[in-house]
Amino acid sequence: MSIRFLKRLRAPLYIQNAYCSKNYFYRSFIQYYSPSNGPYLKISMNKAPQSLGLCTARGDSPTNQDRMAYGYLNNLKDTTNRDSPFFYGLFDGHGGTECSEFLSTNLGKIIENQDLNDTEKILKEVHSVGGYMAGLKPPFSLRTVLQSRDEDLLWRARLYYSFLQADMDYLTNYARPSPDSAVPGAVGTVAIITSKNNLSYWESDSYIIHLAHVGDTRALLCDSRTGRAHRLTFQHHPADVEEARRLRRYNMGFSRDSFGQKRFAWVANTRSFGDGYKLKKLGVVAEPQLTSIHSLRDDWSFLTLLSDGITDVVSDDEVVDIIKLSESPQDAANNIIRYAQNVGAVDDITCLVVRLPGWKKRTINDFTKNLRLEKSAYHPRRS
């Protein structure tokens, strides 16, 4: 395994159905052999609680601006002999639902259809925005990517350019004819899971998780052997040293809000989709953090994607303990939402739980039981 470990009042008491991309429902299923060596049995993912858990709830705002999407990237199977890669995405909107809705509907298709031979066109459009964007340089050369047979590099490039293209496509549709005006934006995390053979990742002895991330959503893995949480993403925030260094090369638009939190321009996140061309020129880009994790079958019990409405009030260890003590991924997602509401979540809260091959091997130890009891007892709204 290779992985980068990072050290880094009031919500309605009900649970809404998950908002998911309808475009992926028709191809979102698990295949089972039934009977042995017989025909495939296909079960829709949103009706497979033992494999995928989805739950979301509105915060204090009038509408829930979080969105989720999942499904096979079927077009990519045409170029390989392997099972289709699977796509999971969580998008946390702000200023409206337009951007998170756009991403849940379109980002999977953009990733699926991304032609790396056309990336110069994407960069040309990005550079035409001006300001910070005019000097944006990919973390890898196009020539290296086109000549490479390294699947990790090819996936990182596909995700990198897909995030940039989605950002430009959204702004083209929503930021005209007033290009300098603010428009709704979103942050998000996408996980692509592939296997190294022609089996689905849940049947394979080894698999790879490719992650792309902007903003303050979060991805966690649970180690099957130790039961511990491993964070895969970090928050793109003005307080982050690397982000502050990146932005200070071009401007000094840092300030603090009334709570003492560091902000850049008028936003809390230094990377996001949408938000208007003016912020793009200042450096609030959709350039993603990219991570690839090579895993053996029993390494990880589950992957979870979370919006910051949860992580603001629930620690990583609490999240992982609640999930691993649940009977199924769907029960786990429901339990996370209920607990976040119980301990004072005020923002929209969304949880997506993906069962990984090590689910049955997970270590059932509860490191945060006392902490959760104390927090639940302290908060006036307790279940």
UniProtKB/Swiss-Prot annotation:
Recorded E.C. number(s)? Answer: 3.1.3.16
Which chemical reaction does it catalyze?
Answer: O-phospho-L-seryl-[protein] + H2O = L-seryl-[protein] + phosphate; O-phospho-L-threonyl-[protein] + H2O = L-threonyl-[protein] + phosphate
Report the record's Gene Ontology biological process terms: cellular response to oxidative stress; positive regulation of autophagosome maturation; positive regulation of vacuole fusion, non-autophagic; regulation of aerobic respiration; signal transduction
Give membrane topology per the record: Peripheral membrane protein
Enzyme class per UniProt: hydrolase
Gene3D superfamilies recorded: PPM-type phosphatase domain (3.60.40.10)
- What are the record keywords, sorted? Hydrolase, Magnesium, Manganese, Membrane, Metal-binding, Protein phosphatase, Vacuole
Domain named PPM-type phosphatase: residues: 51-356
Give the primary localization class.
Answer: membrane
The free-text cofactor remark is: Binds 2 magnesium or manganese ions per subunit.
Q: One Pfam family of this protein, by short name?
A: PP2C
Q: Which residues bind Mn(2+) 1?
A: D92
Q: What family is reported? A: Belongs to the PP2C family.
PANTHER family given in the database record = [PYRUVATE DEHYDROGENASE [ACETYL-TRANSFERRING]]-PHOSPHATASE 2, MITOCHONDRIAL (PTHR13832:SF589), PROTEIN PHOSPHATASE 2C (PTHR13832)
Q: Spell out the protein name for this chain.
A: Protein phosphatase 2C homolog 4
Species whose genome carries this gene: Schizosaccharomyces pombe (strain 972 / ATCC 24843)
